[in-house]
A protein has these predicted regions:
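Membrane-proximal helix-turn-helix segments that form the acceptor-binding/catalytic region
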Residues: 114-117, 121-125, 138-140, 153-173
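Phosphate- and divalent-cation-binding pockets in alpha/beta enzyme and binding domains
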Residues: 114, 118, 182-186, 204
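Acidic anion/phosphate-binding donor-loop and adjacent secondary structure
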Residues: 200-215
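A short, histidine- and acid-enriched strand-loop-helix "catalytic/donor-clamping" loop
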Residues: 10-13, 100, 114, 128-150, ...
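An aromatic- and histidine-rich active-site surface loop
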Residues: 14, 80-96, 105-126, 132-141
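A conserved catalytic-core segment of Leloir-type glycosyltransferases
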Residues: 36-98, 196
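N-terminal subdomain of nucleotide-sugar transferases
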Residues: 1-59, 172
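Carbohydrate-associated surface elements
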Residues: 40, 179, 199
Length: 215
């Protein structure tokens, strides 16, 4: 089976942060051909990856592809909007060049909203099943930056209709919490859904040396 994972915020093995998308990519590549698509920009430290980083992370049946974005210095900024737009444009170009049958399943992180909308629009042409993994609820989470949005019903928020359409394109839904899954299922109630909480790598925890913090 050919599986594509779309995860703009994914960390690679040489980087300090662990996440489910790399874990899933490694696990699936044991028996499937896996393409992991992520950004050349590292959200956590605001630096850029090099093409060699993708080459080093690719192994066996797992291939890593970096899409270019312009980067940003602040998480809440016009620069981030511009950077995401650039990533989405490159993703759209890649998707338009794909041929039917190249992917059997696409597992896509949400957000971004736009990448999931594109995947939904191309799904029938390319013939894959789309699984959307809800990591955060946009636009609802914008209320942490603009508090008055908490008073607005979520379906009246800016971009709510785009969010609902992204959820509706999914053939199955995964989310990091029951609350997030419920939100996605509100828009797309008739597909399978599963909560998979953010976890930890227990072997690494067990191998870590104990530290005495005193009294």
């Amino acid at each position: 089976m050919n599986i594509t994972i779309v995860a703009p915020y994914c960390s690679l093995p040489s980087e300090p942060h662990f996440n489910r998308f790399w874990y899933l990519a490694e696990l699936l590549s044991q028996s499937h051909d896996v393409l992991l698509i992520t950004s050349n920009f590292k959200h956590y430290d605001k630096s850029f990856r090099r093409p060699e980083d993708a080459e080093a992370a690719s192994q066996g049946r797992l291939k890593v592809m970096l899409l270019e974005e312009s980067g940003y210095s602040k998480n809440v900024s016009l620069g981030r909007v511009t950077s995401h737009h650039r990533f989405v444009k490159h993703f759209e170009q890649w998707l338009e060049n794909c041929r039917p049958g190249e992917q059997d399943v696409v597992f896509s992180a949400y957000p971004l909203i736009a990448t999931n909308l594109l995947l939904g629009k191309h799904k029938a042409r390319l013939g894959y099943k789309l699984i959307v993994d809800v990591q955060d609820v946009w636009p609802e989470s914008f209320s942490s930056v603009v508090p008055f949005l908490k008073k607005v019903p979520h379906n009246l928020l800016p971009f709510a209709s785009r969010a609902n359409q992204a959820y509706r394109y999914a053939d199955a839904l995964v989310a990091v919490s029951q609350t997030y899954l419920d939100r996605a299922k509100e828009a797309n109630p008739n597909v399978p859904g599963e909560v998979v909480y953010i976890g930890a790598d227990f072997p690494k925890l067990d191998a870590a040396p104990a530290k005495d913090f005193g009294d």
